[in-house]
């Protein structure tokens, strides 16, 4: 018989830097899950990823206080900022442009994110990412 699911917990945790402090501790503690067990397992699974890169994680909590978790790809905005070496997006994206991104860079990001995106193919994913880039004040070339 399958375990009874108590709930899902969605967090963004820096790769390799999970610790019991907020937001992880309180979120897992409310469900009675072992916080240190999650931190150790998460850090072990994210060893190959660039340290500090924020990763969305979905934790499934079960009635017997056990859990499983799925690590997703980094947010599109983080990957776009990383591709064009940007610290933050524009405060006014319609007037202030902060950088340029090419279609090739967007395709590379799309290939990384495709399994977590709601897009049928790479071209649709590129168009979605181009919209995200524009909303950050980044000029999109070739899309």
Swiss-Prot record:
Entry PTM: One or more lysine residues are methylated.
Xref: SUPFAM superfamilies: Ribosomal L11/L12e N-terminal domain (SSF54747), Ribosomal protein L11, C-terminal domain (SSF46906)
Q: Which GO terms describe its biological process?
A: translation
State the oligomer form and interacting partners: Part of the ribosomal stalk of the 50S ribosomal subunit. Interacts with L10 and the large rRNA to form the base of the stalk. L10 forms an elongated spine to which L12 dimers bind in a sequential fashion forming a multimeric L10(L12)X complex.
Cellular component GO terms held in the UniProt record:
cytosolic large ribosomal subunit
Q: Which GO terms describe its molecular function?
A: large ribosomal subunit rRNA binding; structural constituent of ribosome
**Which InterPro entries does the annotation name?**
Ribosomal_uL11, Ribosomal_uL11_bac-typ, Ribosomal_uL11_C, Ribosomal_uL11_C_sf, Ribosomal_uL11_CS, Ribosomal_uL11_N, Ribosomal_uL11_N_sf
What is the name of the protein in this document?
Answer: Large ribosomal subunit protein uL11
The organism is Delftia acidovorans (strain DSM 14801 / SPH-1)
Q: Upper taxonomic classification of the species?
A: Bacteria, Pseudomonadati, Pseudomonadota, Betaproteobacteria, Burkholderiales
In which family does this protein belong, per the annotation?
A: Belongs to the universal ribosomal protein uL11 family.
Q: Which UniProt keywords apply?
A: Methylation, Ribonucleoprotein, Ribosomal protein, RNA-binding, rRNA-binding
Gene3D superfamilies assigned to the protein according to its UniProt record, in alphabetical order: Ribosomal protein L11, C-terminal domain, Ribosomal protein L11/L12, N-terminal domain
Q: This protein's superkingdom?
A: Bacteria
């Amino acid at each position: 018989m399958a375990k009874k699911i108590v709930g899902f917990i969605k967090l963004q945790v820096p790769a390799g830097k999970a610790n019991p402090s907020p937001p992880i501790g309180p979120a897992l503690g409310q469900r009675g899950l072992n916080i240190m067990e999650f931190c150790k397992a998460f850090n072990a699974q994210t060893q190959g990823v660039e340290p500090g890169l924020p990763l969305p994680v979905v934790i499934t909590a079960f009635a017997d206080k056990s859990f499983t978790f799925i690590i997703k790809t980094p947010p599109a905005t983080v990957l776009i900022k990383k591709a064009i070496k940007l610290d933050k997006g524009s405060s006014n994206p319609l007037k202030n442009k902060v950088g340029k991104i090419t279609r090739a860079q967007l395709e590379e990001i799309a290939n990384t994110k495709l399994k977590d995106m709601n897009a049928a193919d790479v071209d649709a994913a590129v168009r979605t990412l181009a919209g995200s880039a524009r909303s950050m004040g980044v000029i999109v070339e070739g899309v």
